[in-house]
From Swiss-Prot:
Name of the molecule in the record: Large ribosomal subunit protein bL20
Keyword RNA-binding: yes
Keyword terms of this UniProt record: Ribonucleoprotein, Ribosomal protein, RNA-binding, rRNA-binding
Natural source organism: Rhodospirillum rubrum (strain ATCC 11170 / ATH 1.1.1 / DSM 467 / LMG 4362 / NCIMB 8255 / S1)
Coiled-coil blocks: none
């Protein structure tokens, strides 16, 4: 009986890992034992950073909204509170885009938020 080596399977497995390691420096892309560690670590970073990306973009949007709102005389929290009271349901991504690309439209939203805050303040008094 001939010896079974699994050569085809092993070659395919090595090729898959080395293809994923393409572009790594030095032996990290050519040595299978090293490449498998680097590829695993790279996949861990990718998994982690797909989640971090969401947090980073949300904080970027909040910074942009805050800057746009402060130009109009409101803080971020006052602006968001005013939008909620006015019944305007725009997410932070859209608001940040408006603040950067359409300052006039964003200014009208700030005006509506201010008006909603003023009416609730009058009702409370």
């Amino acid at each position: 009986m001939s010896r079974a080596t699994n050569a085809k399977t092993n070659h395919a497995r090595h090729k898959k890992v080395l293809d994923l390691a393409k572009g790594y420096r030095g032996r990290n892309s050519t040595n299978f034992r090293i490449a498998i560690e680097k590829v695993e670590k790279g996949l861990q970073y990718a998994y982690r950073d797909r989640r971090a990306k969401k947090r980073n973009f949300r904080s970027l949007w909040i910074q942009r909204i805050n800057a746009g709102a402060r130009e109009q005389g409101l803080t971020y929290s006052q602006f968001i509170n005013g939008l909620i009271r006015a019944g305007i349901e725009l997410d932070r991504k859209i608001l940040a885009d408006l603040a950067v690309t359409e300052p006039a439209a964003f200014a009208s939203l700030v005006a509506q938020a201010k008006a909603a805050l003023d009416t609730t303040a009058e009702q409370a008094a």
